[in-house]
Amino acid sequence: MPASWPPRTVIRKASGLRTLESALYRNGLGPVAGVDEVGRGACAGPLVVAACVLGPNRLESLAALDDSKKLGEKERERLFPVIRRYALAYHVVFIPSGEVDRRGVHVANIEGMRRAVAGLSVRPGYVLSDGFRVPGLPMPSLPVVGGDAAAACIAAASVLAKVSRDRLMVAMEREHPGYGFAEHKGYSTPAHTAALAELGPCAQHRYSFINVRRLVTAGTPQISGGLTDAEPGQCCELG
């Protein structure tokens, strides 16, 4: 393999979803793990990061990942158990809102990616991350622009993270009724903003986010109870 591999620090989508992964496997750098997150921009709920290792061969049962950007909720739910079944390894990490506040979103995101890779039962030879460079990994890695549309392992990690977080937000709505978490999943929508103004923030809101902090500064009552903040770095391996 030439010393210049990879030829650029950031690679965009090539001719197919498995092109980059196949090149890494051919050059002896497998297994290849993909890492992605969901919930960076939400003002409530955890940041969820998933890492996933797929085998070198394309599986027809995961063909829908080729259009992962277009997947709706039902298709993601259908793919979720299929990915868990056929992945060589996967790990999902939940960074609670309190830790996001303490660390900041970007630092929490990078730390979550490191934890997700560290939790894999199969040690990857190479890691592909969706858009963000992940320092501190014990193996080579590459940030990929639009990664969930450029590498199957990142697309699979994206589905695992998205479904895991969405399910948690639905459960959070039962613990904190009135905010509409099951619908907007913690993102700042007009309905969420109206609920925040009426009810005040709860323990699952990110107080470092300006729309939440502004309400606290204005003296809006805060609601506690329900789901508690997880310990820093709490993670779970699904399946």
Swiss-Prot record:
Main location: cytoplasm
Zinc-finger recorded as keyword: no
InterPro entries referenced in this protein's UniProt entry, alphabetically: RNase_HII (IPR022898), RNase_HII/HIII (IPR001352), RNase_HII/HIII_dom (IPR024567), RNaseH-like_sf (IPR012337), RNaseH_sf (IPR036397)
Cofactor note: Manganese or magnesium. Binds 1 divalent metal ion per monomer in the absence of substrate. May bind a second metal ion after substrate binding.
Location(s), subcellular: Cytoplasm
Record EC number: 3.1.26.4
Any single Pfam family the record assigns to this protein: RNase_HII
Gene3D superfamilies recorded: Ribonuclease H-like superfamily/Ribonuclease H
Binding site for a divalent metal cation: D36, E37, D130
Residue span(s) of domain RNase H type-2: 30-221
Class of this enzyme: hydrolase
GO MF annotation list: manganese ion binding; RNA binding; RNA-DNA hybrid ribonuclease activity
Keywords (A to Z) from UniProt: Cytoplasm, Endonuclease, Hydrolase, Manganese, Metal-binding, Nuclease
GO biological process entries: DNA replication, removal of RNA primer; mismatch repair
Cellular component per GO, a single term: cytoplasm
Cofactor needs: Mn(2+); Mg(2+)
Family of the protein in this entry: Belongs to the RNase HII family.
NCBIfam families attached to this UniProt entry: PRK00015.1-3, PRK00015.2-2, PRK00015.2-4
Known role: Endonuclease that specifically degrades the RNA of RNA-DNA hybrids.
Name used for this protein in its record: Ribonuclease HII
Lineage of source species: Bacteria, Bacillati, Actinomycetota, Actinomycetes, Mycobacteriales
Gene name tied to this protein: rnhB
